[in-house]
A protein has these predicted regions:
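C-terminal ends and interior cores of transmembrane alpha-helices
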Residues: 96-118, 310-327
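C-terminal transmembrane helical hairpin of 12-TM major facilitator-type secondary transporters
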Residues: 302-348
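C-terminal membrane-cytosol helix-exit motif in multi-pass small-molecule transporters
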Residues: 205-225, 413-418
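Helix-to-loop junctions at the C-terminal end of transmembrane segments
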Residues: 75-88, 182, 287-300, 391-392
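Intracellular juxtamembrane helix-capping segments at the cytosolic ends
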Residues: 46, 138-151, 346-360
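Hydrophobic core of transmembrane alpha-helices in multi-pass small-molecule transporters
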Residues: 33, 101, 117-139, 329-346
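Glycine-rich segments within core transmembrane alpha-helices of 12-TM secondary carriers
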Residues: 161-179, 373-383
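Short amphipathic helix-loop junctions that connect adjacent transmembrane helices
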Residues: 45-60, 256-273, 355-357
Length: 427
């Protein structure tokens, strides 16, 4: 076709409806895709890698999680160090740190042999996990502000929905890739505990994260600089902060030790763990809007009470299934409860709605939720340490009984919330 002009890429109509016409959002969305897949790859093998290759025992797993969660606890101070940076630059820094962390895990896996329990190896792996976690936590808040800034003013919510869905789909793709990699390696004779599978996964994850960091580096610099939140405590939010303590403590037990139970107690390999993570991600995508509507219809208080009452059963089944059922049946029950925990945890949105209803303005909402995350992380890192010790001396039955008790206390405390606490003119 002589003389024809090169056609400029035209983005889909539904994106034109959401994003401002002058904004080039392709690169930003592409970064989220790459980041999502890389995260899915890492998350899909992380616990098996620690248990089967690095030989991290249950008590040590709590120590690992303590350090991995420290960036979340210190996030408010980390962001304060970058107070002169626009959000786009903070986003680029976060991507670079994640790429460095993933590359470190790949290099470490390339120089060690199978089933190593050497202390220096454990230290290196934890350091690179913390580096990745630091980048991940840095990205969390600015990703949302960038997504909203690129959108038309009245379409900020739709933009957040698009970016969240893209991230979840990337995670699912990463989980399924892990399953495929270990399935193929198994077919050609490699055992689940052979390090070759982890090298392939971390290598692929490194390539994706480096690509994500390079793509992010090409993003247009913006002047957008969201205010770096300070700690905000007000008496009317006391119940919210206490609820966050119970939620964070109970959730941390599941987040840290539930995968380890499946691996050490039931022999789940990376393929099984990745399939479970993928199923959880699909259910989270499908159930989030439904639970959101339930909160609006039934009220945040009813959801706060109901979800934690269900979680009591989930926790007890997780801790005692191997005592009550045959190994095969117990494994199925534990897998179902693993998925249920992920679904029910979506109901923590009710806590955010509670804050919105008793806040006087949007700034108060943002400051309170940010402080709540910090409070959550304080107790999360402590419960991670304590949980590993409890497992090592008293077993998983005691550990998950404590989780059930925390859920029960959460329900009882949520029942004390009164309707008259709400601010009728809340934003």
């Amino acid at each position: 076709m002589t003389g024809s002009k090169t056609k400029k890429f035209k983005r889909p109509a539904f994106l034109d409806d959401i994003y401002r016409p002058e904004e080039k959002i392709g690169r930003f969305l592409w970064v989220l895709v790459l980041f999502g897949i890389a995260f899915g790859l890492k998350r899909g093998v992380q616990d098996n890698y620690l248990a089967d290759i690095i030989i991290i025992k249950p008590f040590e797993r709590g120590i690992v999680e303590f350090f991995r969660e420290l960036p979340g606890l210190l996030l408010i101070f980390i962001l304060a160090l970058m107070y002169k940076f626009a959000d786009s630059r903070v986003f680029k820094v976060g991507c670079a740190l994640m790429a460095g962390g993933m590359a470190g895990l790949f290099i470490t896996s390339s120089i060690i042999t199978n089933n190593t329990g050497v202390l220096i190896t454990k230290i290196l792996v934890v350091l690179f996990m913390v580096l990745f976690s630091t980048g991940e936590h840095i990205i969390m808040p600015v990703r949302c502000t960038i997504a909203m800034e690129l959108a038309k003013r009245e379409k900020a919510g739709a933009s957040l929905g698009i970016t969240t869905s893209i991230n979840q789909l990337g995670n699912i793709a990463g989980f399924l890739l892990v399953t495929g990699i270990f399935f193929l390696l198994g077919r050609i004779g490699y055992a689940r505990t052979d390090i070759i599978g982890y090298r392939v996964v971390f290598g692929a994850g490194t390539a994706l994260m480096v690509a994500a960091a390079m793509t992010a580096a090409a993003l247009k610099e913006t002047t957008l600089k969201a205010p770096r939140q300070r700690f905000y405590f007000a008496k009317k939010f006391t119940k919210y902060y206490i609820l966050e303590v119970f939620y964070g403590s109970r959730k941390q037990i599941f987040l840290t030790f539930a995968p380890y139970v499946l691996i050490l107690q039931y022999g789940a390999d990376p393929s099984i763990m990745s399939i479970l993570f993928a199923i959880c991600a699909v259910f989270v995508m499908l159930c989030s809007p439904l639970i959101g509507k339930l909160i609006d219809k039934a009220g945040y208080k009813a959801v706060m009470i109901g979800d934690t009452l269900i979680l009591i059963v989930v926790c007890l089944m997780y801790g005692f299934a191997h005592r009550l059922f045959s190994p095969g049946t117990a494994f199925i029950i534990v897998c179902i409860n693993f998925i249920l925990d992920q679904i029910i945890s979506i109901a923590s949105m009710a806590n955010n709605v509670y804050v919105q209803r008793i806040s006087s303005n949007p700034e108060e909402i943002t400051a309170t939720l940010s402080t709540g995350i910090s409070v959550n992380h304080v107790f999360s890192v402590l419960i991670a340490l304590l949980g590993g010790w409890i497992w090592s001396i008293a077993g998983i039955e005691t550990l998950f009984t404590i989780s059930a008790v925390l859920a029960l206390i959460n329900s009882i405390y949520a029942a004390t919330i009164k309707k008259n606490e709400e601010v009728t003119s809340a934003a």
